């Protein structure tokens, strides 16, 4: 049996649960991440005017006191994800350090889709390890 922490994914309008993401607690369990339900709806944490696109749920939660975290569960931005990005004043992209090139490609794709408020923030360490003050400094100083 596998122990997992589960993050619920809700519909942005009805707030009904449409999916979930399970993260294995034991690093030897595979798959590390498992998605249930609608795999095209991103996980969102926070209610701020600015948002940051991240790879995973813990990173989205880590920024939620400062920005809205939007986890796309990897590095591929799907067409449906874009519709979830419309309400935000500024959009930041913070993918893991090994995906910096993909972050810049994602920004280019979003700009070609009509988003003009895109800022890529390359990371030294994974956002899930940042505290609220570190997040605030990273994005607003």
Language-model features: where?
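Phosphate-handling DNA/RNA-contact segment within nucleic-acid enzymes
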Residues: 1-90
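TOPRIM fold recognition
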Residues: 48-51, 57-141
């Amino acid at each position: 049996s596998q122990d997992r922490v589960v993050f619920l994914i809700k519909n942005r309008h009805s707030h009904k649960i449409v999916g979930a993401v399970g993260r294995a607690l034991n690093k030897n369990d595979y798959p590390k991440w498992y998605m249930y339900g609608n795999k095209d709806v991103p996980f969102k944490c926070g209610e701020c005017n600015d948002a940051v696109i991240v790879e995973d749920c813990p990173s989205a939660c880590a920024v939620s006191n400062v920005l809205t975290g939007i986890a796309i569960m990897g590095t591929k931005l799907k067409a449906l994800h874009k519709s979830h990005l419309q309400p935000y004043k500024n959009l930041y992209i913070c993918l893991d350090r090994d995906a910096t090139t993909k972050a810049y490609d994602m920004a280019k794709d979003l700009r070609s889709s009509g988003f003009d408020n895109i800022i890529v923030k390359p990371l030294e360490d994974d956002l899930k390890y940042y505290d609220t003050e570190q997040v605030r400094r990273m994005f607003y100083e």
